[in-house]
Amino acid sequence: MILTKAQYDEIAQCLVSVPPTRQSLRKLKQRFPSQSQATLLSIFSQEYQKHIKRTHAKHHTSEAIESYYQRYLNGVRKNGAAPVLLELANEVDYAPSLMARIILERFLQKHEEAPPSKSVINSMLRDPSQIPDGVLANQVYQCIVNDCCYGPLVDCIKHAIGHEHEVLLRDLLLEKNLSFLDEDQLRARGYDKTPDFILQVPVAVEGHIIHWIESKASFGDECSHHAYLHDQFWSYWNRFGPGLVIYWYGFIQELDCNRERGILLHACFPTDIVTLCHSVA
């Protein structure tokens, strides 16, 4: 789904001060019925992550952490079965999984002899049964499963969806009888930064030569696309030549402005691929 900047801004404006819940996503779908659920979820997640980055610091002051921890303790003393942490996160407009991390780290600092390592905290967030306090373990679990933008469950889902779309792209390339090298093969040859697929014989798409294809199982907004251009796409272009990026959940139309320089954007696998044959001397 390709959106104009104005269409995207209209959706983004509806997400201001909206909690990251499945109920909010359902309301968004009702407001924009012509947009796919996957596209709206991707935009929803990206906009919320921008909000969290803007407000992250205020939740990590020593005063804020102590206030949250005391509110958590008071809440579970009254009713340990109530979703105290989840409600606290929603009240202060912070991601439930990130709130769970703050409280877990504060708990471990108090009850363990040595400061908790990041790997220990990550392991406990992935498997709350490792947390030595049953009430806190349940509170953390509630935060993880009810967070649709952050946390180990979301990370797992995103990884699986990304892999699924890479497999889809591979199948489409094979269906078109296009010869390619994938990321693993390229790294085995010593390349450190590679697109998902390098075409061994370049193709033409809409009159543009394509040497590589990158799969992105997300919506291409300004923030993410400019970061990808800087960190990935221009590096690919510099090393391998012009290429194609597929944003499977759509992108902002105005971002497709580097075609003449050698980076095309698509929201699906192109249907008008022309295979270029090597000339025989």
Curated annotation (Swiss-Prot):
TM annotation in the entry: none
Swiss-Prot/TrEMBL GO biological process terms: erythrocyte differentiation
Keywords per UniProt: Cytoplasm, Nucleus
Protein origin, superkingdom: Eukaryota
Principal cellular location given in the protein's record: nucleus
Subcellular location as annotated: Nucleus; Cytoplasm
Pfam families: TPD
Keyword tRNA processing included in the entry's annotation: no
One Gene Ontology cellular component annotation held by this UniProt entry: nucleus
Function: Plays a role in erythroid cell differentiation.
Descriptive protein name: CDAN1-interacting nuclease 1
Organism annotation: Bos taurus
